[in-house]
């Protein structure tokens, strides 16, 4: 390196670009030569239609070095005020066990994995999710649970639609207890409007004899009241009502379960099991029901099956319920959920165990009882009579001064109504907190020890009929790992069973498994971000709001939109928020009848599932032989439905991995017939810096921050799916009933929410902020260019072995490519799933299987993979093709070969008798480099049919693990 470089070069402000992008300049040159392109710019010219290319580079800030970006974000974080939160309302401060913080939340072996569709290399997190399900089953008293939903409010909305599916009642009315959390009521209102349900919100006692298809109750209630709902539930069910109870897992450690009271569904948030509040998330919602309703339950379910050796193995059960298969007939559009957070919550319970949880839950209740008893003795008007952790009290004219005094002392109380305040306690609450708050309220001191002794000796604040009597959390997993050594080793043992980005590339098409840089992840753990309640006073969240505003402006620049709504917690939820905005727009113009949604047949399964959630009629548009939207068919159907056309949902580049030349014409056709264009942002990673949805002609689009903008997939969540909107749709995006997301005079102020928190999972927005801050305008454009280069390199190298199904007019693919396996299957019986399983033996996760075309695999390498890693993957795929040739040539039989027997486990190679026509080395070390970094699948191929026919979604007994 010459010593006379200018200082600007030595400062390396663009250093992170080289850290994020896999190939170096020399490797890029080699790859460009291999694909027949003179330069990166020429490749892009050959790939992206000139008509949609941006005329100038993105006006984003210059890139920052990692430590500079961290310092800038830390300066924002320092503007947040972390008071002790006593607001409650479903969000509570908590203590994350450090062994879980370090070894799960901060561990790329856990947070960079994908949804466990390839179960043989995901046994660790599948077991962890089974623990979560077992914990939920035990505490709710129901028979089956899913592996998480997005948040409590959307879980409540899902409960309503599930109730409609399973209820035998002919009523169109749904009862909502007025004592539910207001944010849950708000989201349920939004969802109900698009299903045409009549919502009845009120006192449940006044309506318990009414005619409803479903009901939503809260236990404990929003006001803290704990009541036995057994009789109410029995009365409702006698008339055919399906009853859902929103509850609190910590409270259920002590309280009678919803299942014991007769509930059909139980739901809520697992946040207080070790997950920081994070200004609203991310947090894993739980959802449980009766076994009879399992096929109608939304979300993913982990079940038990057996592998080819007959051993117990975990897998995702009943996948035919999901949106990617059933499309508009799916139970829900749920795709991303909250797997990482569910695993953390489950591990919190594993670590503390039943006894530890009872101690924590008992302490919370005792401190609340001490405060309540003190307030009663001080003649404070206590409004909550039977409580777990929350009390409301009427102070009349003194309420405002007490509220402000508490703020000054570092406590956030809840303003309930004029003169009424609320206090909720959590596991961080101390004796000193109780004494301080009592003095602020009663203006005298409290002898905590004396009151404690008296409360302990007296009758409980809860009647015996409400105290849990059944034993819970008895499975050995909840009673074994209580020392840190044991917990650490348990977590490590699970991690060792999973393949994540810390081992090798994950080339899942349409999933964008790029680098999740350590520097991007660090701020998520800062207490200045984790300790903020979503409904805290806005002047305590100045740093958050500054970060969100900054990210909003950057995303507007990147996408070409005029406004951003940060509320959706996933891409699928972003789709829903976008279609809701479109519907509200049409309604504002007196065109409520516009309800037809055009969707290409190649679309993601979430698109039709979301359209039906928004009460739209799906009309499928054909594709031509090249995989592009059939423009003539689109035009004919748009004109046929022009009086009722609401929108087109389209992915760009297409799900076939090609930049369609006619995209602007497609948008124009829809607009000419009165519709709006919704662009699915799943493939935005091929657009950034080169074009944008807004520039192309879309009216609204979601951005998968967990794809394009570096939030990790977490093994199936968290994610974020904010939407960008053009100015005419901006007034119709979601707002929030508790904490408005914008100015009070904004047109959409008060419009129904789609998520529980105003800014969704706000704490992980810091990841995308760091990503954009460190890459800058030049970096994000380079990332897109290299993503396209890597995909074309893979396509070129593999095309002779597996034909690339679709290419653009110049023979290029976008950021992903589809490899056609159908000729191989016709000749040998080897299917795409066999190739997927065999890749495990080479140390790779499979690409996307049989989407968007059955009998194919779709490869998306992303910009973050080096040429060396791409070459290893290419080498593995070519080696597998040569193995298939051995079957074609009759060397191996169609039913006994390395592909049909894949994956191979350590147990296989240790068998005394080897019954295969290929060697043990061929089975597990098929290429020389595999042995140096061997990943061992912990089970053999799993029997999916057996798992669904013998459904078991609870933790197996320990005997199941015996040899």
UniProtKB/Swiss-Prot annotation:
- GO terms of molecular function: glycine binding; glycine dehydrogenase (decarboxylating) activity; pyridoxal phosphate binding
As its record notes, the protein acts as a catalyst of: N(6)-[(R)-lipoyl]-L-lysyl-[glycine-cleavage complex H protein] + glycine + H(+) = N(6)-[(R)-S(8)-aminomethyldihydrolipoyl]-L-lysyl-[glycine-cleavage complex H protein] + CO2
EC number(s) from the headed UniProt entry: 1.4.4.2
Q: What keywords sit in the KW lines?
A: Oxidoreductase, Pyridoxal phosphate
Under the heading CDD domains, the entry gives: GDC-P
Oxidoreductase is among the record's keywords: yes
Q: Which GO terms describe its cellular component?
A: cytosol; glycine cleavage complex
Q: Which GO terms describe its biological process?
A: glycine decarboxylation via glycine cleavage system
Cofactor(s) the record lists: pyridoxal 5'-phosphate
> Where, if anywhere, are coiled coils annotated?
none
> Residue positions of the PTM N6-(pyridoxal phosphate)lysine?
707
Q: Which InterPro entries match?
A: EF_Hand_1_Ca_BS, GcvP, GDC-P_C, GDC-P_N, GDC_P, PyrdxlP-dep_Trfase, PyrdxlP-dep_Trfase_major, PyrdxlP-dep_Trfase_small
Q: Which HAMAP family match?
A: GcvP (MF_00711)
Assembly and interaction partners = The glycine cleavage system is composed of four proteins: P, T, L and H.
Give the family this protein belongs to, as stated in its UniProt record.
Belongs to the GcvP family.
Question: Mind telling me which PANTHER family this protein's record contains?
Answer: GLYCINE DEHYDROGENASE (DECARBOXYLATING), GLYCINE DEHYDROGENASE, DECARBOXYLATING
Query: Its biological function?
Result: The glycine cleavage system catalyzes the degradation of glycine. The P protein binds the alpha-amino group of glycine through its pyridoxal phosphate cofactor; CO(2) is released and the remaining methylamine moiety is then transferred to the lipoamide cofactor of the H protein.
Task: Please state what the protein is called.
Answer: Glycine dehydrogenase (decarboxylating)
Native source species: Dechloromonas aromatica (strain RCB)
What gene, per UniProt, encodes this protein? gcvP
